[in-house]
Amino acid sequence: MDKKLFAIIAVVIVVAAACVVVFATGSNDDDGPVLTGSGRLLVYGNADNNDYLDESDVKMIQNILEEGSWDKEKYPFADANHDGVVTSEDVDYLKKLLDGKEKTRMWYVGSGKTDYYVNYPNTGNIAVTVDYGLMMGQVLGVYDRIVAGTDKCTKYNTDRYPGADKLTNLGTYKSSDYVDFQENLMKSGCTIVMGYIAPALYDSLRESGKDIDQINLSCSAQTKYADNTVVSSILTCGVLLGKGDAAREYCAFADKMEDYFADKMAGSNLSTFAVAYDPRDPAVINCDTHYTTGGAFGDVWTISHLPMKDKIDPQPTGMVKIDTEEFCKNVDPDIIIISLWGAAADKTAPEDVQKIVDERAQYFQTSRAYKEGNIYAVNYESIGTYMGLGALGLLGAYIWPDEYDIDEGWQTFYDFLGKFTYLKLDSIEDLKQCGGLIVYKMTTAN
């Protein structure tokens, strides 16, 4: 098989022009505007659903107006001003956003499939509630604007997040207890807060009149909805921050990796897998899986790009708790992936993590995967986040050494970390010593 990671991807944009007022319909007219894009830029105004907010969207809205009907299901973001109808006002509104000279509400779909807005453009300082905000900052090139964070954020490992210990401490943040956090945030001078934002905090800040925008997006696919993926979140966040080009660099990498993995998904006899999330009790296993609504936890989202299928049916909560004996007997996937959480810092010695992997692999001794040596382990903090696609070639090479090139996997992950993170690694050999980032194979099978 071709092991090339990179392919050229072409996007053709079809545009047209016009101008009238239309309401939503369920029309699916073959002669109407053509949906041309990826559908992952979840910003209102992105009428043609590609990865850009630009003049082609203006033309698409004009074309919809000329057609006289708006298929809201097919073109949800044609409603640039988010008022429920598509009119010539949306054309003017989008032009104002593109001009970027006057602060204008830019609406987007955030985590939980909820619509929020930011005042665009916003070039002020940024506060973060969780590490997702720090991740976004590094990918998009706005890390130097992050000056404040929760108490938790100030304690993150400074290898991955340089200067985290020097952030202004905004205190503890909980979705049900955010009063002190909100007060500290309002005093911080930050005009943006990124990470997980409880809807109640979002509403409270808006009601306060304080000009603080909230970007409720994640660098991990911990969402029950299929459209809020790692890629769509980074792209959407990039456009909200005026850093679309940086976001599209990540998208280009993700596209190349997804094409690479998809090429190996062609066979019908796919291996089955199950993800055992941070197993610590030999008697009971928590298994991450897909949500019934299409989304997935970050580890499952990433691993699903490999030529495997989830052995466990989708669940309303994205996770199922199961007796270990029952798991080994009745689920019994071809491959078990142990998803470690909090087991290691980025630069923990790999041999220390391997001991943890081998200890927890013992829980599955009666499974076919254990007997055949097909238990592997990942660190959720890398595989379950935006770094996952960068590291996934390594996991593929462990599972199928004849199909995936291990050296290429190391090189790809190393290049990824150099481009999209602030980790200081001088060589691939340095990366191999990052026990909290890399992947593992059990070493205890008979």
Tell me what each language-model feature is:
Residues 18-106:
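Cellulosome-associated attachment modules in secreted, modular CAZymes
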Residues 124, 128-187, 192-198, 311:
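A short, structured surface patch at a secondary-structure boundary
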